[in-house]
């Protein structure tokens, strides 16, 4: 918020924002959206928040294939337009390939036939004029995120009674109670992320609290914290760090390398120290850990933070398909 205030102060001619919604709560993002919509000058923004892009942006600059292309419209319009263009290009190539095959068969069949030689020559000229459009593979890559629960949930998930949490002497959660049922996928929202993070930490016994938190006896929980710095304080490689969460059957270099490859860590990248990973890489490593643990309850505190749009899409798909409970 302080950095945003600094950038916005003085009404600049051009406002450059790199991931401005990272770390902001819902109310702050909504305020920023309204501010930018009314902002009269130029705004150039990099963001992985597609809802923010849809609401604020009038143009999309698509950087892919090593080139940049400008679209008029918001994120959804760009996505639909680019996907339609790719489908049309593929359809044109498919029709061209079909025509090439047809002409090649005619030339091969009748080129030695005197009565058909002129037609064969004509077809050969037509064949030489047909060109396939080059379809360059996208530079965008999607990780494979698939959460499986080793054990089904029983009849109870979570009961919270009279929960209170203080941070530095200030009450952030005051006497709250709720019950969640097996299979529930629950989003927690609040006035600020201090409250929701305090709740997540209390549920995972990662902070002192007053009150009662009772998990069902059949639950097994995996936690993705907002602040994962403690998880990556060692100098271990990605491969060795992840190995500690693998089962005996999975504790194999071939398996772990393949597993990490699906999470976009290929080749020697698995030997990188976890302490030097970027924010997005750390979240992908944490998600890899959660997949290996196979818990039936996932507790995720702002899991899309630092992830790119491709990883967010893959995470969305993985969470929708997850048969356990989600907080």
Give the label of every model feature segment.
Residues 1-91, 150-327:
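ABC ATP-binding cassette signature C-motif
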Residues 84-172:
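Flexible nucleotide-interacting loop at or near the entrance of a catalytic core
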């Amino acid at each position: 918020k302080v950095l945003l205030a600094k950038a916005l102060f003085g009404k600049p001619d051009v406002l450059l924002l790199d991931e401005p919604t990272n770390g902001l709560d819902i109310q702050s993002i909504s305020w920023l959206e309204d501010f930018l919509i009314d902002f009269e000058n130029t705004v150039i923004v990099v963001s992985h928040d597609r809802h923010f892009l849809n609401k604020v942006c009038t143009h999309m600059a698509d950087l892919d294939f090593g080139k940049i292309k400008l679209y008029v419209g918001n994120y959804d319009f760009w996505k639909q337009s680019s996907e339609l263009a790719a489908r049309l290009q593929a359809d044109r190539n498919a029709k061209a390939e079909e025509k090439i095959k047809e002409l090649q068969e005619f030339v091969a069949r009748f080129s030695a036939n005197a009565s058909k030689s002129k037609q064969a020559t004509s077809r050969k000229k037509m064949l030489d004029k047909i060109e396939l459009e080059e379809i360059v593979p996208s530079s965008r890559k999607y990780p494979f995120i698939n959460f499986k629960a080793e054990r089904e949930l029983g009849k109870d998930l979570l009961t919270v009674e009279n929960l209170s949490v203080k941070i530095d002497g200030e009450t952030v959660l005051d006497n709250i109670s709720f019950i969640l049922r097996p299979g529930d996928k629950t989003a927690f929202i609040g006035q600020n992320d201090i409250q929701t993070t305090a709740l997540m930490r209390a549920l995972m016994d990662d902070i002192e609290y007053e009150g009662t938190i009772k998990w069902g006896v059949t639950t097994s929980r995996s936690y993705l914290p907002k602040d994962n710095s403690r998880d990556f304080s060692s100098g271990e490689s990605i491969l060795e760090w992840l190995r500690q969460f693998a089962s005996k059957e999975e504790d194999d270099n071939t398996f772990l390398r393949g597993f990490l490859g699906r999470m976009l860590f290929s080749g020697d990248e698995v030997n990188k120290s976890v302490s030097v990973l970027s924010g997005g890489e750390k979240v992908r490593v944490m998600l890899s850990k959660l997949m290996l643990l196979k818990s039936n309850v996932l507790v995720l505190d702002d899991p899309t933070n630092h992830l790119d749009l491709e990883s967010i899409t893959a995470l969305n798909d993985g969470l929708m398909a997850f048969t356990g409970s989600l907080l």
